Each structure stands twice: as structure tokens, then as C-alpha cells.
């Protein structure tokens, strides 16, 4: 990281020396990471050139020094003094609500129950406004719309120039679908300049729209809450207002992470022996919402439900773990930013697996199947308004290891203590420290990986509905896992 990144700030700062052992160690560590000779306790990590990659290195090396902190802590407390005060003091205030605050939504959630004998009629979506069309899910929803519907698809693209918006959309469609839609751009596929952060969305927003599918969001899990609130929460509020204005149906894409069953900031804080269930009738069940991404998506859902109580026709679809296409295993171009994939790479290349995780499972929701499910729900759902679109064909880790063994990958199941010792050793070598970095936010204070949760996500209602309308998830079997692994080997990401 270049020293010049924060040179101006360095020249103007007043150096404040560290006073404690922890402050001294962290200041020295930051100096090494930022390539700055002398870092004081009041110096802001980001003002002096720090970024997300540097923050990951900061957290990993701090762990190696015995200082436990999370990536989100670095964003919340960017100076050494504020970070040490937090780490040595009381926990920061948690995001809390009262369950009674959500009683007003009961009439909406009561619609999402199985009613034997109920039938659903397919309805045309008409012309569609699609936000997030250049994203992983958005692009595949566009593909489904082109295959299953006949109306125009207006794609909201952030850009200041007409040529840029066309080029950006054309580039992503070519990446996923080759030349299939080249001749349709500016015909059925209409890119329009706009931004969900802008009230009104766009100066050229169409009014001949019957359905809005809102997939645009920032899906990073760490950063400032003001940013996530602006994009995910207020951005959704702007989409809702536009839907109300033109009388369009809204399909809002959310995430199952709002359940609290997620690898958030400091997982050990959230563990509980009290088992809770989160289904299509749930919103707030006392789950942790301190992760900035999850909190912003939770609040975005509230904006949609509030509008529904005022008469808006809307559906909220909470999606699961989006993975490679079923058809050919294609994945998103920015694959290195995918947290699940980062962990898969780390565990396969590490070659060790802790015995205490053998009874857990992983969920793979192929992106093309997920997009198909979104359109099925949009076409057939009537009064029902919340869906959990995640695969029920999970794969247990013991079966996953059997499959990767057959693919020639050596994996050894070891005790938790042995796994932890070996994991700590990875910090000492620059070519293996990425392994520790992949898991650093998933460990409790004893260094144990925590992937279980007291919150159980259920999707019985959605599975019943999807079966009624002719949709079923694929098996997560040898064929799919083999294709998944081979894809990342071919592009050079997996080196096993």
C-alpha cells in the first residue's frame, strides 16, 4: 500500500504516541501494513490509505498477536485508540427491537401458509423494470424474462453516458450468455440511466411498467452503516415509491441472512441454546442484526411491508446461497469477492477438516434455478407475499468430502485442537495466510469455527408453493459438485 495514499493527512496530523502494550503492538502493525514509519493512536486507518484488503490483513495479523477483533470492528473503530477502547471495554450497543413493533405485519405474514387444494393461475408480468441487471442474480433473471415473458425489460444501469450504460449491460450479458441477446439490446432489452439512490430513480424512467423486480443491493458484509442504509434501505424506499406512483407490482429480492442465521460480525456473541424457527411468517424473532449488511436488508424489508399495508402489491423473496449455474457451472466474474467460495477454496487447499463440523451441511442454490424460481413466484403468487427461495437439497460435509476425494483432492479429518493448531500456523507464511483470513470472522474466542446456529430457517411453505407451480430444486450430487470444483480449477482459482 503506497505511503503517498495518506501523505497529505500525515503531514497535517499531530502524532499521539501509544500508551499501552496493545496500542503499541497495533500501531507497529499498522505501520507495517500501511508502509508508514510512525503510526499514532489517533491516526485513521482509512485516511492513511487503508482499504478492505488491508483491513483483512490487519485483523489476521492481530489474531496472530493474540488480539481478537473482527473486520467490522476496523470499520467501526478506524483509530488504534478507539479500537482498543472498544476491545477492552464494554460491548458496543446492539441493534435491538421489540417484537411488538412488528405486530402490524401479522395480517401480511398470515397469508404465507399452506392451504391444501389451493390452485394458482399464471399471470403475465407485462413490461418489467429490473434493477441490478448487471449483477449475478439480476442478469439471470433477465435471461428468464427473455425466455418466459414477452414484454420489454427496462434495465436500470448506473452511468453518466448512454454508450457506457449499453456497454456495461452488453458486457455482462456476453459474459453469461454469449451473443444470445446482442440483437435485443435497445429492442426488448432497454438500458436506462438511473440509480436507486436517486429519488425517482431516473430522469428517463418509463411509466409503461407493470412489474418491478428489485435485485440491486450492496452485498458486501462490512463497511459503514450509512453506506448500506443509503443503498439497500433508502434505495429500496425509492423503488417502493416509484412502484406506488405507477401502480406496478414489486418483486423485492432480500436475503435469508435477515434471519440472523449468518456468519456475522462476532458469531460467538450470538450463540444461544434456545432454538428458534424463522419461516415465511417471520421477520423479527430476536435475532442478531448488528451486521451492517443484514441490518440494512432487514430495514429494506420493512419499507416494503409498510407499503403493502398501504395497498402496494409486492412479494419479498429471501434468497439463499447463490452458486454456480446448473447448466454449465458458470459463476460471477468477481468470484474472489464471494465469501462462501473463499471459504471453500481455503478448506480444500488447506487439506484439513475439523471433526466437529462433520454433521453440518452446506446449501447450494444454483443461480439459474434461483432465477427460475423468482420468475415462477412473480408469475403465480397471489396474496402470498414472503418466500424463502433456498435449495432444500443440501449436502452434508461428510458426503462433500467423499466427493472431493473422488476428484483427487486430499482431505483429512482431524480433531478440533489439531485443526486449530495448523490453522494458526498458516498466519506465519505469506502463501498460506489467506487460509486464516478466510475463516478469521467465523471463529469463537477458543478458535473454533462456528457455523451452527440456534436459528433454524424453514421454507416448507415456499417448497409447497413451488411444487404447485412446477418447480423443483436439483440434487446437490456428485455431478454438481464435480462441475463446481472443475470450473474453479479450469479458471485457475482452485489449485488442488
Q: Residue locations for each model-derived region?
A:
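Phosphopantetheine-dependent thiolation modules in NRPS/PKS and related acyl-activating systems
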Residues: 1-116
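Glycine-rich Rossmann NAD(P)(H)-binding loop
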Residues: 48, 319-327, 356-361, 387-395, ...
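N-terminal Rossmann/SDR dinucleotide-binding element
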Residues: 94-211, 215-218, 225
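Amphipathic terminal alpha-helices
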Residues: 97-106, 150, 154-157, 456-496
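Conserved Rossmann-fold NAD(P)-dependent oxidoreductase catalytic core, especially the SDR/UDP-sugar
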Residues: 211-214, 222, 227-230, 234-295, ...
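NAD(P)-dependent short-chain dehydrogenase/reductase
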Residues: 264-277, 305-362, 367-372, 376
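A hydrophobic C-terminal alpha-helical subdomain
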Residues: 353-357, 420-469
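Mid/C-terminal beta-alpha module of Rossmann-like enzyme folds, strongest
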Residues: 373-445, 488
